[in-house]
Amino acid sequence: NITPASIRSMITRKTKAIVCVHLAGWPCEMDKIMELANEFDLFVIEDCAQAHGAKFKGKAVGSIGHIGCWSFCQDKIMTTGGEGGMVTTNDESLWRKIWAYKDHGKSYEAIYEREHPEGFRWLHETFGSNYRMTEMQAVIGRIQLKKMNEWHSKRLDNAYKIWSVAKGCKGLRVSEVPDYIEHAAYKCYVFVKPDELKESWSRDRIIKE
């Protein structure tokens, strides 16, 4: 994962936001990243595509930064029947911009909060694209959301069983997850220590045999 130090080294006068990726389900160090963002007046966008269910110090990922982005692609923790995604935020002004962008620049205020005379209504006030989810996809997603807690618990339990065994195997290395991190275990990484393997053995040979 990126670190506050690596982010700081990349910040310039042109920097507007920090995109932190909770890679493989392991949350970034959000406290220090948010402090850094406040120092430079930057937005923080959490990429939670691989981190459904993960938490940082008891807070769900996607709820710490200014915006959370989620993937529902077919190979992610949950899916909406192929492709899909979600954006979350507690900032209403950002939400209105996101809402408009996903529907060809259509204004939420113009549709729901403005009186119009009879006849044609011009509702598109900015640029945008089509990111509207179909109703069938939404149904699939809503059902899977109800199962997320159960899936998360089972996946994490399986991952820790694998890591527990791998820790006792010479030639293998397992990353230590801090107590304040709740991993989503989208990936269950176990690393090979090449210098501890016998001659002619490698990561690829282990996988093959």
Each PLM stretch: what is its role?
Residues I64-H66, G81-G82, M133-E135, A185:
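A structure-centric signal for secondary-structure junctions around beta-strands
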Residues I2-A5, S9, A17-V21, W26, ...:
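PLP-dependent aminotransferase class I/II
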Residues G82-E83, R142:
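Amphipathic alpha-helical segments within well-ordered protein domains
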Residues I2-T80, M86-L94:
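Active-site phosphate-binding strand-loop segment of PLP-dependent enzymes
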